[in-house]
């Protein structure tokens, strides 16, 4: 959703932004599914020095995306445990 919104803010039409986002997600998931490479290896394979992916990854790192993912996943896991207990009572 955020990727599509930003794409539109950068001047893409809604249709093109949606298609780019869905194709990016589909391509990444298919690569991960069929490859024997680790996620880190796949990232290295698609990251051209000085390219757009490298720039985006650098921004993610600088802005603390890893910490955001860790907090979000931990929070969701904790909520799943709470819900499991609620349903088992």
Per-region residue spans from a language model:
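NAD(P)-dependent Rossmann-like dehydrogenase/reductase catalytic/cofactor-binding core
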Residues: 18, 22-89
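Anionic-ligand binding region
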Residues: 1-19
